[in-house]
């Protein structure tokens, strides 16, 4: 079972490496969106610090959503998705592997570059660690939730818009508690409550989302 999971993750990561432009698009989108706000809001440090948590999280959310179309569409187009559904292991395990690969390709680079981007918002140095931890908890959850929407729209023309409508309402709790953790840390308050809720949501998503995504894939491919 673990060997199958490893094969799926390595396969998707290798395919993504061959399509470097797609991977870079997500990262550049995050950097550009987050960098436009300081240019438009002016150099006021207090305003930048106050707006930074929400801006960084919205940019990460939109960048994550931008890459959801690559989760299943390529495999559906070349017929390999149907072959993956025939493996003896549960389809939920296949979903977990693909979500892990998606996060390694799209989510982890955002997590690593976010503290650097946060410097232009004059965030306190102590808040950068909280930002990193919040994104480490929140971005996998974005991938898990997004996988459900991506599975429901496999093979649908214009599915990207439909995915956005499906997953954006479900992203709201992640946005609230992720930005809240960074804001609490920046203002000298305790961010552990927000981080604990993010961790609980991630655990819940890890348990439920793969099965929901597997069911959505079966419905879409029937």
Segments from the language model and where they lie:
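Junction motif at the cytosolic side of a transmembrane helix
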Residues: 206-222
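Long, hydrophobic alpha-helical segments
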Residues: 52-68
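Membrane-interfacial helix-loop-helix connectors in multipass membrane proteins
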Residues: 40-51, 115-136, 154, 181-196, ...
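Hydrophobic alpha-helical transmembrane segments of multi-pass membrane transport/permease proteins
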Residues: 20-42, 58-60, 166, 170-177, ...
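Transmembrane helix boundary and interhelical loop/hinge segments in multi-pass membrane proteins
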Residues: 65-85, 99
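A structural motif at transmembrane helix-loop-helix junctions in multipass membrane proteins
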Residues: 129, 134-168, 218-222
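Hydrophobic alpha-helical transmembrane segments that constitute the membrane-spanning cores
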Residues: 96-121, 141, 145, 178-179
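Aromatic- and glycine-rich beta-strand/loop motifs that create alpha-glucan
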Residues: 1-26
């Amino acid at each position: 079972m673990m060997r199958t999971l490893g094969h799926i993750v390595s396969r998707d990561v290798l395919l993504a490496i061959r399509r470097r432009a797609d991977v870079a698009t997500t990262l550049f989108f995050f950097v550009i969106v987050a960098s436009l706000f300081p240019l438009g809001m002016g150099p006021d440090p207090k305003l930048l610090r106050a707006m930074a948590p929400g801006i960084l999280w919205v940019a990460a959310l939109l960048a994550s959503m931008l890459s959801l179309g690559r989760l299943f569409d390529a495999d559906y187009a070349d017929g390999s998705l149907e072959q993956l559904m025939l493996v003896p292991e549960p389809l939920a395990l296949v979903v977990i592997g693909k979500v892990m690969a998606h996060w390694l390709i799209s989510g982890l680079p955002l997590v690593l570059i976010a503290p650097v981007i946060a410097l232009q918002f004059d965030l306190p140095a102590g808040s950068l660690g909280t930002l990193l931890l919040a994104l480490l908890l929140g971005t996998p959850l974005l991938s898990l939730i997004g996988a459900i929407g991506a599975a429901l729209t496999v093979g649908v023309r214009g599915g990207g818009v439909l995915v956005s409508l499906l997953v954006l309402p479900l992203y709201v709790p992640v946005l609230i508690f992720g930005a809240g953790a960074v804001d609490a840390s920046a203002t000298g308050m305790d961010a552990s409550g927000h981080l604990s809720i993010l961790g609980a949501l991630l655990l819940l998503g890890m348990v439920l989302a793969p099965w929901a995504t597997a069911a959505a894939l079966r419905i879409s491919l029937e």
